[in-house]
Amino acid sequence: MGGGGDTTDTNMMQRVNSSSGTSSSSIPKHNLHLNPALIRSHHHFRHPFTGAPPPPIPPISPYSQIPATLQPRHSRSMSQPSSFFSFDSLPPLNPSAPSVSVSVEEKTGAGFSPSLPPSPFTMCHSSSSRNAGDGENLPPRKSHRRSNSDVTFGFSSMMSQNQKSPPLSSLERSISGEDTSDWSNLVKKEPREGFYKGRKPEVEAAMDDVFTAYMNLDNIDVLNSFGGEDGKNGNENVEEMESSRGSGTKKTNGGSSSDSEGDSSASGNVKVALSSSSSGVKRRAGGDIAPTGRHYRSVSMDSCFMGKLNFGDESSLKLPPSSSAKVSPTNSGEGNSSAYSVEFGNSEFTAAEMKKIAADEKLAEIVMADPKRVKRILANRVSAARSKERKTRYMAELEHKVQTLQTEATTLSAQLTHLQRDSMGLTNQNSELKFRLQAMEQQAQLRDALSEKLNEEVQRLKLVIGEPNRRQSGSSSSESKMSLNPEMFQQLSISQLQHQQMQHSNQCSTMKAKHTSND
């Protein structure tokens, strides 16, 4: 059994060295001491734990009862592209302390239940897997595993600036997503005094760095805000990571947890569930409630854009904004975010819109949770301003039209009064002309009557004057001519006077008509 364990340790060390030795990383490297002699010496401390049976523990997952038979499995090897980071960049790999809740499944399966098949995590990177007795030579469970999928703790420059790790009890609750106080107490009650004597400060320091790198979500937001140089490539990367995340992440819902991420081969690679089992509220390391609209992406080692990051210098943390950028006035003191970003979610804002958002506190609060709603609000405001401007312009045009119509009405009223005066003058002139016509008709009738009388008188005179006797007739004719001549002269004079009076009346009427027309 001891020889088989040493051979397994040597093979796993060769695989780690072959996968990490050829990688080129831009981050500063630390010495990673994986000493086979140290691991072999740890086998001497497993016998005290295998002498007495451990207390019974409730099963963690459906896979805990799988018989230890060699079955085919599909797992991703550790020879993935390691240009993103090297194992040399991690802090010294020491055995994890029993009080640190790496994973309930890992602790119970590796340190207490020899019959459970250990995971690659406990076989390769945790010395606690050497205490599993006969179970250390058993193959891993049949499942689809990712080895180095979520690498977010290898940033040495981040870990130097992180805060202190939270209490271990809160970490255990956040990891399991349910009430695991009984299991954590069981794990804490069995310290391995022989091996950890004198090493506990180093172990706690290393695990504090690991958990601090996980729990400091503000630094992880920097990775989430990286969108890539090309928009299409960035969207493809996001979809790829979200699909891989959806297929293998742990979900805590009412106490049930999936162990598809349990076999991560990196040291201290703990999947911390950020959702509460009762209310589903996301929480940070310090206990404050994070915004509900935020979406965190896992940093996959096989993502095509991870080779472009340079975690060595702090300038690489200032990444271009992407679909997960946010606006938060509280981030002004963190140094890794500006006052406002140009892009929120899938909505892009112009400089004028950013000024409006900065001026309005409500919009600044809403834009963190729902940037599309802020976009709609700004669009509604712009449309309302345009409609108001159109209404104002329309009212001004109507007022101008009213003024024009009023001036036209006054002009038309003046013209109407003038036309009324003209019509009155024409009516008077027409009446005068009628009177003149009647007078002329009367004069014509008088002339006709006078001419008839003259003709009758001539006939009568012819009858009276006969020729009984030419002599007498000659003498009488001369006397009659002398007597008739005065009468004829009188009638002619009367007719002439009447004719003159008619002409004078006509002249007077024409003068009056001309005078009225001139007025």
From Swiss-Prot:
GO CC, any one term: nucleus
InterPro entries recorded: bZIP (IPR004827), bZIP_RF2 (IPR044759), bZIP_sf (IPR046347)
Subunit (UniProt): Interacts with WUS, HEC1, KNAT1, KNAT2, HAT1, BEL1, and NGA1.
Region span, Leucine-zipper: 398-433
Key words, A-Z: Activator, Coiled coil, DNA-binding, Growth regulation, Nucleus, Repressor, Transcription, Transcription regulation
Predominant subcellular localization, coarse grouping: nucleus
Region feature Disordered, mapped onto this chain: 1-30, 45-83, 108-202, 222-295, 315-339, 465-519
Region annotation (Basic motif) ranges: 372-393
Protein name (database record): bZIP transcription factor 30
